[in-house]
A protein has these predicted regions:
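Subset of outer-membrane beta-barrel
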Residues: 1-296
Length: 296
């Protein structure tokens, strides 16, 4: 289920209700269509710390008038070291290093003035390495692949509303040792909308407010989970965000309230977020997210 770990401080702070959001390499992990109208090159690092582990996603985005928007990304998740000990004495003689890696290549393009489309191909790898005296410790390296696809559409009404649909983690079962031990990928279907509250701009100059609402579930969409988020910005410089994930999907994802802040300084965008899910917060260690983007 490491493919479901949320990536990106902005996305987390908005309650992960981001399927209709545009701009920023976080869209690689949510809806690749959100990259379609990017106008500047971007290098970004998205860092996370949670009870699951510590992870970093690095992305490079390149917009081309002729080809569309191309993005390459790597996500690395370290779920913690485990000691190898001598039976009976407990003396540590080695260290087990379990890790997850995802390599992603994304293509996105606008279609006319109202439609965005995007596709991501991902190669996921689970590795268990060992250092030191590792006799009897299994060394594992398993690789699988998946596809994410999404579209966004600007509704032709006076209000600025975008809707989005994305399917993530489509692909064959992830095989660890043999076919009997393979697991199906956590495929998700997410639909939602974002609305820019333009009437507030006339009341508070320089203030922009955007609200998002999404639903997400497995492909059967029998019991979708709702997600909401709001983004308040002042002169495109300072941002306050909040969101809520109402329930988990099949016990696989974190849920609860989230908050975040963002600052823009020239070409640099800094975003921070915290997710107050019941389990991690109960242990006094809510997941923390930090994103740094450089646009040029």
């Amino acid at each position: 289920m490491f493919l479901l770990i949320p990536i990106g401080a902005k996305s987390v702070s908005l309650g992960q209700a981001v399927v209709a959001e545009q701009g920023g390499t976080e869209a690689v992990w949510w809806n690749p269509a959100g990259l379609a109208r990017a106008e500047k090159k971007e290098i970004a690092v998205h860092h996370l710390e949670s009870i699951v582990g510590t992870g970093d996603a690095v992305s490079f985005l390149y917009p081309s008038d002729a080809l569309g928007v191309l993005t390459g990304s790597i996500f690395y998740l370290d779920i913690g070291e485990q000691p190898v000990t001598v039976p009976g004495t407990g003396t540590q003689v080695g260290t087990i290093l379990p890790r997850f890696l995802v390599f992603a290549a994304t293509y996105a393009t606008p279609i006319g003035s109202r439609v965005n489309a995007g596709l991501t191909y991902k190669v996921a790898q689970f590795r268990v390495d060992c250092t030191g005296f590792c006799t009897g410790v299994p060394i594992i390296s398993s690789t699988g692949s998946a596809i994410d696809a999404g579209v966004q559409y600007s509704i032709p009404i006076p209000a600025p509303v975008w809707v989005g649909v994305a399917v993530r983690n489509l692909g064959p079962k992830f095989q660890v040792k043999d076919s009997e031990q393979s697991d199906p990928l956590p495929t998700r279907l997410q639909v939602g909308a974002t609305y820019e509250v333009t009437p507030l701009q006339r009341l508070a100059r320089g203030v922009d407010v955007r609200v998002n609402a999404d639903f997400i579930d497995e492909l059967n969409f029998e019991s979708p989970s709702a997600r909401i988020g709001a983004d308040i910005s002042y002169r495109k410089f300072a941002y306050f965000r909040a969101g809520y994930v109402f329930k988990e999907v099949e016990g696989s994802e974190q849920y609860g309230p989230s908050i975040g802040l963002g600052l823009t300084a020239g070409r640099v965008q800094l975003d921070m977020a915290r997710l107050f899910d019941e389990f991690s917060s109960g242990l006094g260690d809510p997941p923390t997210y930090l994103s740094v983007r450089y646009l040029f």
